[in-house]
Design a protein with these regions (language model features):
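Bacterial N-terminal signal peptides that target proteins for export
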Residues: 1-10
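Short microdomains enriched in Cys/His and/or Lys/Arg
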Residues: 20, 58-73
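Short Fe-S-cluster ligation motifs
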Residues: 67-93, 99
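C-terminal capping alpha-helices of c-type cytochrome domains
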Residues: 86-129
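Detector for the c-type heme attachment site
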Residues: 41-48, 66, 116
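The canonical Cys-X-X-Cys-His
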Residues: 35-46, 111
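Bacterial N-terminal signal peptides
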Residues: 10-18
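Electrostatic cytochrome c docking/interface patches
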Residues: 18-34, 49-50
């Protein structure tokens, strides 16, 4: 009898903790929207080419995100998910406007989750369209 109560408490804690664990890993679907509508749009406009998540492996994306270097080291990658950047483009970009109030760290985790989800060596290699 005494074993049932701790087991029940543990089960409730696990069930309640699952959404927090999923949130800590990022929302790849929201990351996909942001990546495609903000990152891809900018890359196509500035360089004439997009960078699909499937162009890199999970390890390559992790190294890129950890290095926090964008535009061959000229910029911080984090700037492109910052509220300052989103505010600067929200008049012409619906995703930047839609996610204007999302915390920067959360949005960065979403983008990380998307590129990891769509990486070359994932189960779902993803393009940009």
């Amino acid at each position: 009898m005494k074993l049932h109560k701790p087991l029940a408490v543990t089960m409730v804690a696990v069930v309640l903790g699952l959404p927090l664990l999923a949130q800590a890993e990022g929302d790849w679907k929201r990351g996909r929207v942001y990546y495609r509508m903000v990152c891809t749009a900018c890359h196509v406009e500035k360089t004439g080419a997009s960078i699909a998540p499937s162009t890199k492996t999970k390890a390559e994306w992790a190294a890129y995100m950890t290095a926090d270097k964008h535009a061959k080291g000229k910029d911080s990658l984090k700037y492109y998910v910052s509220k300052k950047y989103r505010d600067s483009i929200k008049a012409t970009n619906k995703a930047a406007e839609k996610y204007a109030d999302v915390p920067e760290a959360e949005l960065l985790e979403d983008v990380k989750a998307f590129v990891n989800h769509g990486a070359k060596d994932s189960d779902n290699p993803a393009g940009c369209s």
